[in-house]
Structures are given as C-alpha cells and as structure tokens.
Amino acid sequence: MKIMNKKIDVTGIGCAAWDLIGTVKNYPMPGDKSPMKNFEEHPGGQVATALTAVSRMGGHAAIIEICGDDYYGDMIRKNLSHEGIDINYLIKDPGKTSLLSFCACIEDTGERAIFFTGGSKKSLEPEDIPSDLIMSSKAILMDNYHGKASVYAASLAEKSGIPVVTDIERNKLCNDELFQKGTHHIVPVQYLLEYTGEKDPETALKAMWNMYHSELIVATMGDRGSIAWDGRNFICQNAYRVDVTDTTGAGDVFHGTFAFGLTLGYDVPVNLKFASLVAGLKCRNYGGQKGIPYAGELKNLWKF
C-alpha cells in the first residue's frame, strides 16, 4: 500500500498516563524512609510518550486510548492536545479514574523504579478501534495494554500492509497474537530473554524471529545500545551518550522515533541511529516527555 497520501504518520494504541516523579539518593529498605530531593508531575505512558516524540520530530500523530474524567485524565488530554497529537479518539470514561504512575529516580544514575495503578477506567474494546483512522495511518504503534483491541487494530493494519511497531515489555495473553501480526518488534533485552528462554541477546533475537518471521526484531539494552535481527543480519547501534538525569520514557521515545523513521523511509541502520539519538537526548531531563527534543534542536546532529 502506498503511504504518501495518508493523513496520519503514526497512530498509537495504548497507555496515556500521568507521572509523579521523585528523586532520591537511594531506595529505602522496607520500613525505612528516604527523602525526595526533587518532586515533579509530568505526562507519561508508553504510547503517549512515543507519540510525543513523533510530534516533536515533525510528524502527525494520533492516539486511541481511554482516560477517566478525573483531574489526571484532564491533564493527560490537555497535554496531548498541546503536543499537537490528534485526540479525537481519546475516549473519556465518565466517573472513572485514569492511569497514574509514581517514578522513583536514583539521583546519581537516573535509573528508576515505577509504581502504577491502571485506574478504574475501562479498557478499549475492538469496537472502539476506528478502522478509518487505521487505514489513514502510515504506521501503527501499540503496547499490549488493551489486549483484544490492539490485536484487532493489528489485524486491520496487517490486511492493508501497514507496518505495526510493538512496545511489549511484560507478559499478557495477547502477546503471541501481537507478535504474529506486528511487523517490527522492539523489546527490552530482559523481556526478550525471558520470552524466548535464551541466555544471550543474539540467540534470543534469532529464536523470536524463528517464531514469528517478522520484518525486524530489536533488543534495547539501555546504555549498551540496541541490536536488531532481520532474518539475515545483525545490526548494532551504540547508545547516544549524554549526561543522564532520568531514563524514564527513553524506551518509549525510541519506539516512537523508530515508527516515525519508518514513515520517512529510513533503512534499519539509519533508523536505529535516529531512534538512539532522540531517546538519548530525552534522558537529559526529568520525566518521560520533558527532555524529548524538537526537530529544530537536531539541526546539527541529524539531517531529515
């Protein structure tokens, strides 16, 4: 299918959240306390953060998701709209609460632990997926938060030859179907090893590719960069080096930037470099989205 006449670059299906972020010297032991040196509120969620990266890189993004009608739901909607993301299919669930996360960041390393509640809002169902939006998109990005709805959306995209990038990092019943129907799987290395039962990234990538014969499988490895397998070759990419403040959202930014790179026609080595650059720059600031650069900031680092 030709994609140049489509209106949306990347449509995302999955988490939009509100993040509460505290910085600590170290994590307390059970029963102990640790003072926070900094506390901030930021927009978050896997897909919402990924789409923010798409929008800031100059792409046209849309989200399919459900929020509550609470304070945090209002903040999520306002932020996505402010970022230029199409929220026509961001459903409000009356009387329900939204997805909320608390991120505890280690001051010296930027590493973080995340605690979250999904809220009382309902999940997306297949009937909530607008087929016209899927068909109007150059690429689809999804996590596994909404299960059946995401599988349905992936099926629509698969039938029309639209690339589907998955962001899956924990077990759910829908994972096998999403891996079958998706085209590009970007997986944290620890989950990749767990999912395949292998001991090293290279063997795990091959094992997963043999299961699904996807166009590409990428293992993200934090400050060790990423490695991909396309069924013939390994492609390696170093992490982009910055002074790290907070790694929250870096993987989500990698996913979003990579999905946008597909719509720009980038080959795998170029796209991995693009995603690594933008994800690395994100880590300069607290929060999943605050540090995401705008395209203009990349003028001396990247040529679109």
Stretches found by the model and what they are:
Residues M1-I66, Y71-K78, H82:
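Glycine-rich phosphate/adenosyl-contacting loop at the front of the ribokinase-like
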Residues K2-I8, P35, P201-F304:
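Conserved phosphate-binding/catalytic region of the ribokinase-like
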Residues N38, I64-D69, N88-S98, E169, ...:
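Beta-strand->loop->alpha-helix junctions that form or flank phosphate-binding loops
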Residues S55, E158, T263:
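Gly/Ala-rich phosphate-binding loop of Rossmann-like dinucleotide-binding domains
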Residues N88-D93, C103-A139, N144:
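Conserved phosphate-binding/catalytic loop of the ribokinase/pfkB sugar-kinase fold
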Residues K121-P130, K148, T166-L173:
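Active-site glycine-rich loop that binds ribose-phosphate moieties when present
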Residues A154-C236:
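Conserved phosphate/ATP/ADP-binding segment of small-molecule kinases
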